Amino acid sequence: MGAVTDDEVIRKRLLIDGDGAGDDRRINLLVKSFIKWCNSGSQEEGYSQYQRMLSTLSQCEFSMGKTLLVYDMNLREMENYEKIYKEIECSIAGAHEKIAECKKQILQAKRIRKNRQEYDALAKVIQHHPDRHETLKELEALGKELEHLSHIKESVEDKLELRRKQFHVLLSTIHELQQTLENDDKLSEVDEAQESTMEADPKP
């Protein structure tokens, strides 16, 4: 067991004494001794009562000193309790701050984890696509092919326009030829009619 402190000894004595309950008894005893001392009939009896009063006064002084010590001890304990209370409050406030900081760190860690997952998913998607250099090459080749096809288209359109014009000229020629043939047929019919008329008329 550890050493017993003075405060513990005083506390035990207070418990035994009934927390100062004997002071009233001592005061009553002091008053009775004082009355007996005043009414003493002999010097010996007066001296005896005087010694009792001194003893009772010493006990009262000791009790008062003990009470003051207990009071000071209680004040020190109250100050100590207030100090401990403030330390506990500071510890609680510090714990709340640490909890808030931990929550922020957890949220930040969640965001970092989410960003990392999104980055990994995007990286997988990018890996399935061709390389940028190869894509540029393909785009360049497609551009050249498109340019070549554009030239071919222009050439085909030019040829088609030429054929359209030639067909138009051919149709015009055929139309003129038909007109000519029709005119020739009409002339032949007129000539035949004239010849028939001449053959039908007799010479005089």
Curated annotation (Swiss-Prot):
UniProt-annotated stretches for the region Interaction with THOC5: 50-137
Parts forming coiled coils: 146-204
Family indicated by similarity: Belongs to the THOC7 family.
Domain of life of the source: Eukaryota
GO BP annotations listed: mRNA export from nucleus; mRNA processing; RNA splicing
One Pfam family linked to the record: THOC7
Function (record text): Component of the THO subcomplex of the TREX complex which is thought to couple mRNA transcription, processing and nuclear export, and which specifically associates with spliced mRNA and not with unspliced pre-mRNA. Required for efficient export of polyadenylated RNA. Plays a key structural role in the oligomerization of the THO-DDX39B complex.
Residues the record lists as Phosphothreonine modifications: T5
Region entry Interaction with NIF3L1, spans: 105-204
Organism whose genome encodes this protein: Mus musculus
A GO cellular-component term linked to this record: THO complex part of transcription export complex
Compartments, record wording: Cytoplasm; Nucleus; Nucleus speckle
Gene designation per UniProt: Thoc7
Tissue: Ubiquitously expressed.
InterPro entries in the record: THOC7/Mft1
Keyword list, A-Z: Acetylation, Coiled coil, Cytoplasm, mRNA processing, mRNA splicing, mRNA transport, Nucleus, Phosphoprotein, RNA-binding, Transport
Protein name: THO complex subunit 7 homolog
Stretches for region Disordered: 182-204
Subunit relationships: Tetramer; as part of a THO-DDX39B complex. Component of the THO subcomplex, which is composed of THOC1, THOC2, THOC3, THOC5, THOC6 and THOC7. Component of the transcription/export (TREX) complex at least composed of ALYREF/THOC4, DDX39B, SARNP/CIP29, CHTOP and the THO subcomplex; in the complex interacts with THOC1, THOC2 and THOC5; forms a coiled-coil dimer with THOC5; together with THOC5 and THOC6, plays a key structural role in the oligomerization of the THO-DDX39B complex. TREX seems to have a dynamic structure involving ATP-dependent remodeling. Interacts with NIF3L1.
Residue numbers of N-acetylglycine PTMs: G2
